[in-house]
């Protein structure tokens, strides 16, 4: 048994898009994977079935990560099945796009609750386990919108900027116990979140002149989650954006 085949990854929002690609990528390394989903059990079960068909081990667990009680149950179910959590990928997220002056409070709050508070709840719960294990890797999915802003996404941009600050702070708090915390910031990725956008004006701001693929984001996550070379990386944000944001 290799080290990875004994490890367990929890991926939130893993029934589609980047989350699905990440669950499949981590399972391909031999890790056991918990496929979290909020609504579509059919899609989540399909991800689990694909992992099992490829020789891996996975379960699907429903939970709204913005709800503290449901997060607690998600962690309990994971531990009942696999006894440990070595990797947490905080991927679950939503958009409620509209200009600031048209944005309703519920549109603001729904995005903040899931995209930021959900990261807090899952990270806090899993950190307790990782501190006892004296090891663990947490990867938070943020966005280039959290760095550069995006009209019509004040709620989303604020939440994703918050994730970056949260990542840096928690990385400092957990580092002494061997737990790394990093963020991955996708740009425009070919998922259902972008399929209805007019690509032409967007591509003008992407030096590589194309949308990214979920698997390209998942590759960066897989590196941070599993590669020994990532053990000395913490508190960083990795852009996977075709060159949109350069510092």
Curated annotation (Swiss-Prot):
Catalytic activity field: a (3R)-hydroxyacyl-[ACP] + NADP(+) = a 3-oxoacyl-[ACP] + NADPH + H(+)
Lineage: Bacteria, Bacillati, Cyanobacteriota, Cyanophyceae, Synechococcales
Pathway(s) per entry: Lipid metabolism; fatty acid biosynthesis
An example Gene Ontology biological process: fatty acid elongation
Similarity remark: Belongs to the short-chain dehydrogenases/reductases (SDR) family.
Superkingdom, natural source: Bacteria
Enzyme Commission number(s): 1.1.1.100
Primary enzyme class: oxidoreductase
Active site (catalytic residues): 156 (proton acceptor)
Known outcome of mutating residue 151 to F: 2.7-fold increase in activity on acetoacetyl-CoA
Biotech exploitation of the protein: Mutation of key residues to match those found in its paralog PhaB increases its activity on acetoacetyl-CoA, not its usual substrate, which might help shift cellular metabolism to make poly(3-hydroxybutyrate) (PHB), a compound that has potential uses as a renewable, biodegradable thermoplastic. Poly(3-hydroxyalkanoic acids) (PHA), of which PHB is among the most common compounds, are prokaryotic intracellular storage compounds with potential uses as a renewable, biodegradable thermoplastic. Cyanobacterial PHB synthesis is particularly attractive as cyanobacteria use CO(2) as the carbon source.
Annotated substrate binding sites: 143
Consequence of substituting residue 160 to A: Almost no activity on acetoacetyl-CoA
Protein name (record): 3-oxoacyl-[acyl-carrier-protein] reductase
Keywords: Fatty acid biosynthesis, Fatty acid metabolism, Lipid biosynthesis, Lipid metabolism, NADP, Oxidoreductase
Annotated organism of origin: Synechocystis sp. (strain ATCC 27184 / PCC 6803 / Kazusa)
Record-listed NADP(+) binding positions: 11-35
Single annotated GO MF: NAD binding
Role this protein plays: Catalyzes the NADPH-dependent reduction of beta-ketoacyl-ACP substrates to beta-hydroxyacyl-ACP products, the first reductive step in the elongation cycle of fatty acid biosynthesis. Is capable of reducing acetoacetyl-CoA, but less well than its paralog PhaB.
């Amino acid at each position: 048994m290799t080290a990875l085949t004994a490890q367990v990854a929890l991926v939130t929002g893993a029934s589609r898009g980047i989350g699905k690609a990440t669950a499949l990528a981590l399972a391909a390394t031999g890790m056991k994977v918990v496929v979290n989903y909020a609504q579509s059990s059919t899609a989540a079960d399909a991800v689990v079935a694909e992992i099992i068909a490829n020789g891996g081990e996975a379960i699907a667990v429903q939970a709204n990560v913005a709800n503290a009680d449901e997060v607690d149950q998600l962690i309990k179910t994971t531990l009942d099945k696999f006894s440990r959590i070595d990797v947490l990928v905080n991927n679950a997220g939503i958009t409620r796009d509209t200009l600031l002056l048209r944005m309703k409070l519920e549109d603001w709050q729904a995005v903040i609750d899931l995209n930021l508070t959900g990261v807090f709840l899952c990270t806090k719960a899993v950190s307790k386990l990782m501190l006892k294990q004296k090891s663990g890797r947490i990867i938070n999915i943020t966005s280039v919108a959290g760095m550069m802003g995006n009209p019509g996404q004040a709620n989303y941009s604020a939440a994703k900027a918050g994730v970056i600050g949260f990542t840096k702070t928690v990385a400092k708090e957990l580092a002494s116990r061997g737990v790394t915390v990093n963020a991955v910031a996708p740009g425009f990725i070919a998922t259902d979140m972008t399929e209805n956008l007019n690509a032409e004006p967007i591509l003008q701001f992407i030096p590589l002149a194309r949308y990214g693929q979920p698997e390209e984001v998942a590759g960066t996550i897989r590196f941070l989650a599993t590669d020994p070379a990532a053990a000395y990386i913490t508190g960083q944000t990795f852009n996977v954006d075709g060159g949109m944001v350069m510092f």
